């Protein structure tokens, strides 16, 4: 994760071991989760939300470009660390690196993680503005080639149709 340029707490100490599995204690990262900022009823500046969407997209893009995929990326697992100066960019921390797996397809990885980010607000009835969704997707895509971009949007469209179909079945 560090090689990919993603802020994530480093495990402090092993707490428990069961066979080949370890439970590690992670340091506490102070701040609000991305989800808390989106659902906050307090007035939050649009610039802050745009920067948050851009930062989330960068995290998704960096994970995917590193040949990885976070199989359970949620807005609750990204902490926005408070900054003392207004001019400094937001510091986003991925606090749940447990779901990281290898991925052989950049576009599959991007779609999977963006889809996972969208599920929680949808399930809670939180309307995320389209502008924030677009900023997040653009930031995640970065400099993809035209062919990869086309493939990405085909997969994303299929994913959206599948999720709508599943929602109607319930």
In which residue ranges do the predicted regions lie?
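Conserved kinase catalytic-core helix
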Residues: 2-8, 37-71, 76
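A glycine-centered beta->alpha junction motif in the catalytic cores
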Residues: 28-44, 99-100
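Active-site-proximal flexible loops/turns
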Residues: 17, 34, 79-84, 103-105
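Conserved ATP-binding subdomain of kinase catalytic cores across diverse folds
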Residues: 1-34, 61-66, 170
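Conserved protein kinase catalytic/activation segment
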Residues: 77-94
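C-lobe/activation-segment region of protein kinase-like
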Residues: 90-166
């Amino acid at each position: 994760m560090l090689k990919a340029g993603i802020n994530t707490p480093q495990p402090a100490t092993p707490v428990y071991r069961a066979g080949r599995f370890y439970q590690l204690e992670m340091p506490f990262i102070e701040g609000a989760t991305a989800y808390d900022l989106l659902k906050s009823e307090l007035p939050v500046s649009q610039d802050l939300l745009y920067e948050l969407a851009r930062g989330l997209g960068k995290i998704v893009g960096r994970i995917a470009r590193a040949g990885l995929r976070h199989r359970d990326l949620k807005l609750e697992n990204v902490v926005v660390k408070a900054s003392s100066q207004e001019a400094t960019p937001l510091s986003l921390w991925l606090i749940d690196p447990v779901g990281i797996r290898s991925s052989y397809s950049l576009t599959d990885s991007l779609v999977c993680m963006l889809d996972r980010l969208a599920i929680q607000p949808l399930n809670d009835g939180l309307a995320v503005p389209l502008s924030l969704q677009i900023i997040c997707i653009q930031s995640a895509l970065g400099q993809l080639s035209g062919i990869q971009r086309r493939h990405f949007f085909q997969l994303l469209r299929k994913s959206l149709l599948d999720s709508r179909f599943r929602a109607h079945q319930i």
